[in-house]
Amino acid sequence: MPYANQPTVRITELTDENVKFIIENTDLAVANSIRRVFIAEVPIIAIDWVQIDANSSVLHDEFIAHRLGLIPLISDDIVDKLQYSRDCTCEEFCPECSVEFTLDVRCNEDQTRHVTSRDLISNSPRVIPVTSRNRDNDPNDYVEQDDILIVKLRKGQELRLRAYAKKGFGKEHAKWNPTAGVAFEYDPDNALRHTVYPKPEEWPKSEYSELDEDESQAPYDPNGKPERFYYNVESCGSLRPETIVLSALSGLKKKLSDLQTQLSHEIQSDVLTIN
């Protein structure tokens, strides 16, 4: 029997950084599955391999490698075309499965030199740190508060390295998580009493509340079930928020389709065995 509900989606807000939308006519298990897929199953590109050629800074090589991996990289235009490195036929790295970055900075002045994401030079103009979006390529012209700090160098210190970014997803490592935050709520007026407030009148109301100003929470509904879910998905900058949502829904749909196919094969095998 096909799933009886017919879910609907309504977008309430869309910006460059986040999307808010409402899903109706579904249940809590499906809603939470969608949330988890946003975080763990949507692929993006992140630095995964680092070779440090010179490092006289105060940070160990491992510290710097970890910081590089967590710098968000713009992945919109290439993530679907890039292969997973485990599926590529190359021996190490190639343009089909990776993007190369280089960094070469030496401090020759008395003033502290901030090495930032702006100093990472990509061999692909489509994959750059999110802070370098729509910026020129002059490494000396940077705005400190806009870029992600990697390390600080004093006079005579240097950092020189080569790194490769690969395709992956959040279930493998947090650096491949495309979201900065994912949240959903399903009972803005607390009619189901899944949350107990010590003083409901002092608790801030949800932006989706339909109560009057003098009401603190809706009457208790003991038979109620959550059917409407209010989502807020914030991107880390690697993908546009709408791309995250569409990719997640596509991935979840494929998982369910694969499960249905496998179950059909299992049922057919059981029928043949019984006969």
From Swiss-Prot:
InterPro entries reported in the protein's UniProt record: DNA-dir_RNA_pol_30-40kDasu_CS, DNA-dir_RNA_pol_insert, DNA-dir_RNA_pol_RpoA/D/Rpb3, RBP11-like, RNAP_Rpo3/Rpb3/RPAC1, RNApol_insert_sf, Rpo3/RPB3_RNA_Pol_subunit
Pfam families in the record: RNA_pol_A_bac (PF01000), RNA_pol_L (PF01193)
Sequence positions bearing Phosphoserine: S124, S257
CDD domains according to UniProt: RNAP_II_RPB3
GO biological process: transcription by RNA polymerase II
Subcellular location: Nucleus
One Gene Ontology molecular-function label: protein dimerization activity
GO cellular component: cytosol; nucleoplasm; nucleus; RNA polymerase II, core complex
Region Disordered, residue ranges: 203-226
Gene3D superfamilies: DNA-directed RNA polymerase, insert domain, RNA polymerase, RBP11-like subunit
Binding positions for Zn(2+) per the UniProt entry: C88, C90, C94, C97
Record's keyword terms, sorted: DNA-directed RNA polymerase, Nucleus, Phosphoprotein, Transcription
Homology family: Belongs to the archaeal Rpo3/eukaryotic RPB3 RNA polymerase subunit family.
Database matches in HAMAP family: RNApol_arch_Rpo3 (MF_00320)
Subunit structure and binding partners: Component of the RNA polymerase II (Pol II) core complex consisting of 12 subunits: a ten-subunit catalytic core composed of POLR2A/RPB1, POLR2B/RPB2, POLR2C/RPB3, POLR2I/RPB9, POLR2J/RPB11, POLR2E/RPABC1, POLR2F/RPABC2, POLR2H/RPABC3, POLR2K/RPABC4 and POLR2L/RPABC5 and a mobile stalk composed of two subunits POLR2D/RPB4 and POLR2G/RPB7, protruding from the core and functioning primarily in transcription initiation. Part of Pol II(G) complex, in which Pol II core associates with an additional subunit POLR2M; unlike conventional Pol II, Pol II(G) functions as a transcriptional repressor.
Function: Core component of RNA polymerase II (Pol II), a DNA-dependent RNA polymerase which synthesizes mRNA precursors and many functional non-coding RNAs using the four ribonucleoside triphosphates as substrates.
Annotated NCBIfam families: PRK00783.1
Name of protein: DNA-directed RNA polymerase II subunit RPB3
Species this chain originates from: Homo sapiens (Human)
Gene this chain is encoded by: POLR2C
